[in-house]
C-alpha cells in the first residue's frame, strides 16, 4: 500500500504527564529547510508528524485512547486543517497507538495545533477520556522520490 504511513497528539494539550519533543524550526518543502536538510527533500514536500502515544496499563487507558480517537479526536484535527494520514495499533506494544498527520509546512502545523488546543470540543473530549500517556513525536519531510508527498 503506497500511501500508508503514521501519526499522533500534542503534549501540552493533555492533563496527564507526557513527554513530547519540540518540533524543528522548519518542516515541509525543501525551500523552507536548511541546505543540509533540503538536499533530499522534495520541492513539494509536506510536513509529516509521526506520533506514538503509550498509555498506562491502568484503567484500560489504551481502549479509552482508541475510543477518544474514534469518537472525535481525528475529526477535531481535520476540522482545524490537518490531514490524518493513518492511525495504527502497535502489535509489539499493545499499549501504544501510532498515528501520522500531514501539514503544508511548519506554520500550518502550528496553526492546526493552536486551533485544536483551543477547541472547546477537545476540552470536553479530554475530560471524558482522561488517559495517562507518554508521547514520542517525529517530524519529517518527504524525499524528492517518495510516493507520499
Model-derived regions: residue spans:
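Positively charged n-region of N-terminal signal peptides that target proteins for export
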Residues: 1-4
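Bacterial N-terminal signal peptides
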Residues: 7-15
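Short S/T/G/P-rich N-terminal loop/turn motif that feeds into the first structured element of a domain
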Residues: 19-120, 130-149
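Short, surface-exposed beta-strand/loop patches at domain edges
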Residues: 123
